[in-house]
From Swiss-Prot:
WD repeats lie at residues 65-109, 112-153, 159-198, 291-330, 333-372, 375-414, 418-457, 462-501, 503-544, 546-585, 588-623. SUPFAM superfamilies: WD40 repeat-like. Pfam families: WD40. The gene is CFAP52. This is Cilia- and flagella-associated protein 52. It comes from the Eukaryota. Microtubule inner protein component of sperm flagellar doublet microtubules. Interacts with BRCA2. Interacts with the CCT chaperonin complex. Interacts with HSP70. Interacts with AK8. Interacts with CFAP45. Interacts with DNAI1. Interacts with IQDC.
Amino acid sequence: METQASPKDEVAEAVELELEAVIGFNGHVPTGLKCHPDQEHLVYPLGCTILIQAINTQEQNFLHGHGNNVSCVAISKSGLYIASGQVTFMGFKADIILWDYKKRELMARLSLHKGKIEALAFSPNDMYLVSLGGPDDGSVVVWSIAKREAICGSPAAGLNVGNATTVIFSKCRDEMFVTAGNGTIRVWELDLPNRKIWPTECQTGQMKRIVMSISMANDDSFFYLGTTTGDILKMNPRTKLLADTGPAKDKFSLGVSAICCLKMGGLLVGSGDGLLVFCKSPSYKPIKKIQLQGGITSITLRGEGHQFFVGTEESHIYRVNFTNFKETLITTCHFESVEDIVFPFGTAELFATCAKKDIRVWHTLTNRELLRITVPNMTCHGIDFMRDGKSIISAWDDGRIRAFAPETGRLMYVINNAHRIGVTAIATTSDCKRVISGGGEGEVRVWHIGHQTQKLEEALKEHKSSVSCIRVKKSNEECVTASTDGTCIIWDLVRLRRNQMILANTLFQCVCYHPEEFQIITSGTDRKIAYWEVFDGSVIRELDGSLSGAVNGMDITVEGVHFVTGGNDHLVKVWDYNEGEVTHVGVGHSGNITRIRISPGNQYIVSVSADGAILRWKYPFPS
């Protein structure tokens, strides 16, 4: 928890950065994507934040308040309240936050559960909120929304069964709800005068099932349970008996991970392998179906369900019209750690990011994905645009350098076996004739790029460990490489040999030339930002870059007046270069920041993080 406590001291004297946009969606949260009852907004989690995204415009609102990743989200039937739960460390209290939707602010913080909040549900008339604790907690608690306090609690499952993982309220009565999980299905009655909840175990006979998802019919006649086996159970909440199960054959692959009842009858079912199906009881055979990318974790209706939204584990949000059952991808993002971000030379209109198995090009103002280049089962560690804009050069962990056309994503050429233990860093010269790459074994290699050929000019062997960052001087006669062996080396690119070496007791993660190119700034795991003389490699000054974690990314403006840093303390910091003071701090990331860039023309700062999020900030000074 120390990473959450310490940033407050630094934020005190610095001005807060203005967050303009977030590209990101945590698709791993079960039923995390919700369509608000006003039918104009989507609500979904990203790290510790909850995003309220307007469906028809680019407008976004952010709910900040959780100290750790959000694990569940619920919206009341009236749309007045949003509730969200989080995970935390073992033995610590995990908070539930009740938000006022209209004012977009925190109303109450409800703390009782330990470790994790598994699921949340509102009663139909906004009277109660029921919460389910995680495996270390195992309790179910009913909260009064008016008084904002707990009414009563109870262990969620019996002694000889597994944990309960899902909860749903009755659609008509404020006193009944259902919990289900590993081998347990319970219907609960709330007894308000005695402040107790009474469970009744549902009988499924010989069937033993682990419940993944749950949905209640509009008139409370039945509720449906999706299981890891890939079938659906239909239960009667009054008799607590099994009505029917299905499908008998062709069960849903990787389990029924999302389920949703429609008012007109029938079910929408999402499976763990990305199949979206419309089916009806009792056969549960697919009437309509489409295949989506990534396991489906959320299905949420817009209004009565003529249109609905689907969220998948690969951070895709689809809009589907029920009548023609065709999907439209409306939001997408990286679902793994983003390794690098880069702007093309001289334009801030678009930028590229890379992560596991793909490179994506984004339109800056609309947050739209323009292009996706996929290389299956590989991780891209670094990218750079050639100065002429004709190719994107990328560094991959299979030891290859790949070049792609930025408009089409066509593979232009591959340099095989560029490095032994993967390519970890890459840079290009401004005359577009050379590519400089760094590898996991510590070699720095200079490649000559011709019209049809790619030739190795020199392998520079000095570093003992992986190269983390490469920057080239404007004149293309010199470059600096930072390595995790604790050295930064300045190379002469004309004679292809070492000019100067900088030693420090740290794993260097990032390096920048000052625009006047007589100084460099470095940072890394010792949290210090150091200024060095290029000429003799002597240290000029050291600043404390962060109080709590490594600094992973850094970029400097063209004028050299300000620079930005980001790292494991999840904060974006803008620094005055000469004073060495933090002028602005950006709070919003919930994963470790991996890389950060200032756009050409100093309009935006774009930072990327290990949870797959891309954040765009307004550059605080007039350009």
